[in-house]
Amino acid sequence: MAYVPAPGYQPTYNPTLPYKRPIPGGLSVGMSIYIQGIAKDNMRRFHVNFAVGQDEGADIAFHFNPRFDGWDKVVFNTMQSGQWGKEEKKKSMPFQKGHHFELVFMVMSEHYKVVVNGTPFYEYGHRLPLQMVTHLQVDGDLELQSINFLGGQPAASQYPGTMTIPAYPSAGYNPPQMNSLPVMAGPPIFNPPVPYVGTLQGGLTARRTIIIKGYVLPTAKNLIINFKVGSTGDIAFHMNPRIGDCVVRNSYMNGSWGSEERKIPYNPFGAGQFFDLSIRCGTDRFKVFANGQHLFDFSHRFQAFQRVDMLEIKGDITLSYVQI
């Protein structure tokens, strides 16, 4: 079953290195780039480049370069006409060898804002117009799990915060037919606290997609995601991943739990790992994708699913991004 990304949300899972690909729609204020991966045990350095074109020797608007070399630091720079500019550096290393990480670049009007594992790390002022940037390059001593482009204007004013996600970018990308695209209603929330309760404005509708990105704590036992009717407490869809075991699905209606569903091809929730969930509401079922792979379907038991107006997330996790 093919994974259909939501509008404005462009993920690539398990890309190979070196990664050199166009930025969908080009770089613009308000865009965020999420990079999830693992720093290798023998890591010495890696880099992320925001490049002006795909050719060798192309200008690099922003060079991000963590270095484990006895003087652990992160170097920032710009290259124009084959010449590097003045280095900026921070003598602090937010990455740990052998550990998962989440690296976020937020494109602001005056600078790039770098966030590592949910903590703001650095701001790098634009030396080249960001509109010139066309490609993202990643290489070095790391393993990539996913790269996500969250696109467009208007700009987010701060981190955490919100920004509006527009429709699919057009340049360099041919989207599926419009009738196959999920509909996303609300702005994304960055780094919301756990437990999280969000309001589904207008209720749950067919073809609406919920995106949840987070991190399973190393000591985690489980987490819970509920699609609820606020006025009654009914739970149309209860999803309960149990770390190292199974993913339980159920519903709670009229004061009683229904029959559990547990069968899945694999459990994508591991202690100390990031996850990327896409939950799409259809006319007769929920479709759940984890890290771009179909995980399971859950048929509607609560037929008036349009009355579902709350999303509840709790458990042994941190959240980096929720789009409702």
UniProtKB/Swiss-Prot annotation:
<dbReference type="InterPro" id="IPR044156">
    <property type="entry name" value="Galectin-like"/>
</dbReference>
<keyword id="KW-0430">Lectin</keyword>
<dbReference type="Pfam" id="PF00337">
    <property type="entry name" value="Gal-bind_lectin"/>
</dbReference>
<keyword id="KW-0597">Phosphoprotein</keyword>
<protein>
    <recommendedName>
        <fullName>Galectin-4</fullName>
    </recommendedName>
</protein>
<dbReference type="InterPro" id="IPR001079">
    <property type="entry name" value="Galectin_CRD"/>
</dbReference>
<feature type="binding site">
    <location>
        <begin position="257"/>
        <end position="263"/>
    </location>
    <ligand>
        <name>a beta-D-galactoside</name>
    </ligand>
</feature>
<dbReference type="GO" id="GO:0042742">
    <property type="term" value="P:defense response to bacterium"/>
</dbReference>
<feature type="domain" description="Galectin 2">
    <location>
        <begin position="196"/>
        <end position="324"/>
    </location>
</feature>
<dbReference type="GO" id="GO:0002780">
    <property type="term" value="P:antibacterial peptide biosynthetic process"/>
</dbReference>
<comment type="function">
    <text>Galectin that binds lactose and a related range of sugars.</text>
</comment>
<dbReference type="InterPro" id="IPR013320">
    <property type="entry name" value="ConA-like_dom_sf"/>
</dbReference>
<comment type="subunit">
    <text>Monomer.</text>
</comment>
<feature type="domain" description="Galectin 1">
    <location>
        <begin position="19"/>
        <end position="150"/>
    </location>
</feature>
<dbReference type="GO" id="GO:0030246">
    <property type="term" value="F:carbohydrate binding"/>
</dbReference>
<keyword id="KW-0677">Repeat</keyword>
<feature type="modified residue" description="Phosphoserine">
    <location>
        <position position="259"/>
    </location>
</feature>
<dbReference type="GO" id="GO:0016936">
    <property type="term" value="F:galactoside binding"/>
</dbReference>
<dbReference type="GO" id="GO:0005615">
    <property type="term" value="C:extracellular space"/>
</dbReference>
